[in-house]
């Protein structure tokens, strides 16, 4: 929970995920040139932060000392992922759209890569930067996120993954 600057894990450390949940899967297009598959998940998630966290925020209590809790009220979240594989493409195109009606929650897409590397790349205002995958011991932010403008990427000897996005300026390895 939190906002675009500060993220706080809820006290129950509950992660709500599509992993292991039933999905609607349909083949939207299939021809000699490409195949498009659509995967849809409907999940019930807390509608926002709980009353205690709201009170702490209104009292301007230091965010790093706040105790986070979630609302008991649930709202539906729709997650649609479209997989496109084209005959001449060098990789699989993945487009995920999330209809998020919940407030004050972080929503992320996770891409397990199986890559073995200690570095990754991301764009910044005027360059592509190389960063270590793990922060050093002096890193005090409870969130391990990094900033980017349009993409983050990593690779090893066997392959790689580039995630390009619009409107989301953070990522975590």
What are these regions (language model features)?
Residues 1-173:
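C-terminal (or distal) subdomains of carbohydrate-active enzymes
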């Amino acid at each position: 929970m939190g906002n675009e600057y500060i993220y706080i894990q809820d006290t129950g450390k509950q992660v709500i995920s599509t992993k292991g949940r039933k999905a609607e899967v349909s083949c939207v297009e299939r021809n000699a040139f490409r195949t498009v598959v659509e995967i849809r998940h409907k999940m019930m998630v807390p509608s926002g932060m709980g009353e205690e966290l709201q009170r702490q925020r209104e009292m301007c209590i230091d965010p790093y000392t706040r105790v986070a809790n979630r609302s008991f009220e649930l709202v539906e979240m729709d997650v649609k992922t479209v997989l496109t594989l084209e005959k001449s493409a060098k990789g699989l195109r993945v487009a995920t759209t999330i209809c998020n009606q919940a407030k004050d929650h972080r929503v992320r897409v996770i891409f397990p890569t199986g890559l073995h590397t200690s570095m990754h790349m991301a764009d910044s205002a005027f360059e592509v930067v190389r960063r270590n995958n793990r922060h050093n011991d002096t890193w005090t932010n409870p969130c391990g996120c990094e900033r980017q403008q349009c993409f983050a990427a990593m690779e090893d000897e066997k392959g790689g993954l580039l995630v390009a996005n619009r409107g989301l300026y953070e990522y975590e390895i």
